């Protein structure tokens, strides 16, 4: 784990799901050496939300959604794509935030022990020259194995990071390899209806970062 990244507290997740979904934008998702800045989220809240997996009650699959907050909820869709969610709200109330998109900004090499050769370069002039723009992949820089890409869609995100069903029910709080961290990055976002569903389509529970992210303002 990069020593500058500190996992969010359980209290962060144990709140109103829409607040959590909004405040996750701009947060860093760290997974086994890969780092991403979250840019799109959706809320799924309670048994009264027809699009929520818990709408039909507590099952073996949805048990994790009933708490405690701050755990991962990973499931398979269409028999081929994994989706990553973070459990929210208080114990006993089923809710989660779906992570729909992110900017992947580094590979495992950036978090090696030898920060004098890698990490320090990212926080110096190299990082100041890197801009992440909408719908653009920038594959080569003068830092070894650095990749920058925008990932749209929860299935693509999990595929790129390597997240699968084995990463379901993971505690994101007491973890060095899978967690979310705050780097004080505030990003403008728009609010829309959720997509890819057939029920509860009227709810404005999708949050999407509206502007490109400028790495000149990021330090971690």
UniProtKB/Swiss-Prot annotation:
<protein>
    <recommendedName>
        <fullName>Putative 3-methyladenine DNA glycosylase</fullName>
        <ecNumber>3.2.2.-</ecNumber>
    </recommendedName>
</protein>
<dbReference type="GO" id="GO:0003677">
    <property type="term" value="F:DNA binding"/>
</dbReference>
<keyword id="KW-0227">DNA damage</keyword>
<keyword id="KW-0234">DNA repair</keyword>
<dbReference type="InterPro" id="IPR011034">
    <property type="entry name" value="Formyl_transferase-like_C_sf"/>
</dbReference>
<comment type="similarity">
    <text>Belongs to the DNA glycosylase MPG family.</text>
</comment>
<dbReference type="InterPro" id="IPR036995">
    <property type="entry name" value="MPG_sf"/>
</dbReference>
<dbReference type="InterPro" id="IPR003180">
    <property type="entry name" value="MPG"/>
</dbReference>
<dbReference type="GO" id="GO:0003905">
    <property type="term" value="F:alkylbase DNA N-glycosylase activity"/>
</dbReference>
<dbReference type="GO" id="GO:0006284">
    <property type="term" value="P:base-excision repair"/>
</dbReference>
<dbReference type="Pfam" id="PF02245">
    <property type="entry name" value="Pur_DNA_glyco"/>
</dbReference>
<dbReference type="InterPro" id="IPR022438">
    <property type="entry name" value="RPE5"/>
</dbReference>
<keyword id="KW-0378">Hydrolase</keyword>
